[in-house]
Amino acid sequence: MKKKLASVLLCTAMTAAVLAGCGGSSSETDTTAAQTSEEGSSAEGESTAAQTAEAQTAEAAANLTEFAEVPEDVDREQTLTYAQGADPRGLDPALVDDGESSKPIVQMYEGLTKFGDSNTEVEPCLAESWDISEDGLTYTFHLRQGVKFHDGTDFNAEAVKYNIDRQTVNKTSDMLYADFVFGDVAACNVVDEYTVEIVLSKPSTPFLNNLAMSLGAPMVSPTACEAAGNNLNEAPCGTGPYKFVRWDKNEAVVLERNEEYWGEKGVSKEIVFRTITDNSARVVALTNGEVDIIDGIDANVVDQITAAGCLLNKTEGMNINYLAYNTQKLTDPDVRRALSEAVNVPELVQSLYRGYASEATSILPSFMPGYSADVTQTQYDPEDAQAVLAEKGITEIHMLTYTNPRPYNTATGQTLAEAIQGYWDKVGVKCTIDAYDWTTYKEKIGTGDYDVCLYGWIGDNGDPDNFLNLLASEDIEMNVAQYHDEEFNQMLSDAASLPNGDERNAAYADMEQKVADENVWLPISHQENLAAYVGNVQNFIYHPTGNTFLSQTYKN
């Protein structure tokens, strides 16, 4: 007997869109939050300000968990402009791994499955339905008919096979998400024009979630991909509600509505993703009407945004902001432990994020399956840190970081690095910081030439496997700690095959404790997803994965 899957993992990512002011000038707007958090206030006071603003606006009309029906009289010739803090690395979902690329990608591409509007419940997309064999190894997908890629190529079973084979049997080293999405795929077989069979090497509980991910999983046009030499970074071609127009590097990506889209047509005629690297400049662009939506918001500019009468959208962050030790250079776990002991993480998080991030006591956010409050991290102990580091002869450390804001660290990597540098200086360790823009930083990571680096992760699918898998990756751009442990890898493989429930959750907690005991990472914080938009923007949802699906978002 075969069983039909109704849904799998539900990630309870609670959404709270905060209405801090509505439409109007700063003189007409309630600025209580700004007054509460005055210049020079303590970290505790700043945290209270954030909590006060949240409490005052908890019943905001902008709080959405699903997209509302779009009015018939809405202007469908409008342009929606979204500003983010870095340029995309590329627009081929198989060849990139960053959020700045993902945001335009999700407007243009789709996968076999998709997530709910504000959660990680799996829903049909390019596959209308699927069956799973009793042994959990064979997935039979029944595809949506009549769908075409933007270049007119038919979407069918052959197209699915092309995409999966591209990242399995024909995988190249720059396909960073291939193992995350298709690592357990043994074969992909065409049954008929609109039926495809995917065979796994072992049961995989997160497999359907993986197929809904914004990177790796989306279907690209085989025709366009072949014509572009297997690289669609600058010539994207999917099935989604928006099509590619142009990419002005370091300035903007421009998309237009796909008038032939199989589903509900996009509202805006055009969507523009602007790159504005400076946090303050991005806020100014919002408040003076140059852009409609911004993300990557530093807690220090929240008051400026609310005072201008803009809306602040806040969702619980499915992410982790961390310091990674290069275990191939810092091979002594006692040295790694001592360096972690020198950093006062609670104080650091409070001072940098002003209540818009929480201390990470775990790699996994507390609302995710697999999280356990029993997992213990290295605690602040500067006296022991200084003694151990002196005994080990550690006087210098080289740190690699990034200069721009990230969704998991809106304070910027450089600001965080300088704060950690200050803690290490107090225990007699001089830290040299090399900071680069995001693209250059990723290139530097690839060399492995660092003792420690700052990094982070945004959960792609609501499953703990997606976080812990980083520490088993052979790709240094994913596994920046260069942690390679056969026992851990086996634990990870076993856990992925377990059904959701207590046993599986305990398995991930055991993995977390193992890497915590070995001080592979120093978990720092879980950043709340912060976006802001002008008062006439409607139907905006900041998804827990950090993406923003904008086809039904509009200005009234």
Residue ranges and their predicted role:
Residues 248, 342-370, 412-419, 442-556:
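Detector for C-terminal structural segments
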Residues 83-134, 165, 237:
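N-terminal lobe/hinge region of extracytoplasmic solute-binding protein
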Residues 128-173, 197, 331:
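Aromatic- and charge-enriched surface segment that lines or borders ligand/interaction sites
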Residues 390-460:
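Ligand/substrate-recognition segments at binding pockets and active sites
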Residues 177-224:
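Surface-exposed binding/hinge segments that line
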Residues 116-117, 204, 212-266, 270:
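Gly/Pro-rich hinge or "lid" segments in bacterial periplasmic/extracellular proteins
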Residues 258-303:
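Ligand-site clamp/hinge motif
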Residues 254-257, 331-422, 510, 555:
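Append "and occasionally in soluble cytosolic enzymes with long acidic Gly/Pro-rich linkers
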